[in-house]
A protein has these predicted regions:
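ATP-dependent carboxylate/acyl-activation modules
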Residues: 1-175, 181-184, 194, 200-206
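Histidine/acidic-residue-rich catalytic or RNA/ligand-binding cores of hydrolases
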Residues: 188-189
Length: 206
């Protein structure tokens, strides 16, 4: 963009000792009523590519670069099907060991409880009971939501949709894919705080 010449790496794609990850940038906060649930259609308005010594470092850098905030306060888990719950179980254990308070919707809370992971149960929005997910978000108790839908069918008024919209309106970090959520927790587990991330010049990656 600046008209400067950049030397091409001399290594092949299979010889690099670093990893590159691209993260999408979304603008759901500007789209009133839009469900921030990713499907096959293109929804991002841009992407950021970041490099790291391993996939966890590169992934965390890429997320932070598109405005994703690392959790400091509390995490809400609503992990969809029993298969998704099982796939996320070890990640939930890591979140607990990291000392992050875990909140969970009823079915997820029960699954965690059965596997000896402590969580605070919050009712779904459509249940209209207290304590509920929406009030916890409004009270500032949650700064990361992992909300994995049971299916990709779009319905105008579901508890999942209401949670995701509230998350977007409050600028809270959101993950809706179990693989992405697992990778994020692995990155958080191995790296810890964003202050541990190193910014290197391009020359160090040649």
């Amino acid at each position: 963009m600046l008209g400067e010449k950049v030397d091409c790496p001399s290594k092949s794609a299979f010889e690099f000792d670093f990893v590159g990850v691209k993260a999408p940038q979304f603008s759901f906060s500007r789209l009133k009523g839009a469900d921030p649930l990713l499907g096959v259609e293109m929804a991002s308005t841009g992407e950021v590519a970041c490099l790291g010594d391993n996939v966890e470092e590169a992934y965390l850098k890429a997320l932070i670069s598109v405005g994703f905030k690392l959790p400091k306060i509390g995490v809400l888990l609503s992990t969809g099907t029993i298969e998704s719950k099982a796939a996320f179980l070890e990640s939930a254990r890591k979140l607990e060991q990291l000392g992050l308070p875990i909140f969970a919707t009823p079915n997820t809370h029960l699954f965690l409880e059965q596997n000896d992971i402590h969580s605070t149960m919050l009712h779904q929005p459509l249940d209209k009971k207290s304590p509920g997910v929406i009030e916890a978000i409004e009270e500032g108790l949650i700064d990361l939501v992992i909300n994995v839908p049971r299916s990709l069918e779009r319905k105008d008024l579901t508890s999942g949709y209401l949670i995701r919209r509230k998350v977007v309106e409050y600028g809270i970090s959101l993950l809706t894919n179990i693989q992405a959520a697992n990778l994020f927790v692995d990155a958080l587990w191995s790296i810890g705080d964003e202050e541990e991330l190193l910014v290197k010049p391009w020359s160090e990656y040649n």
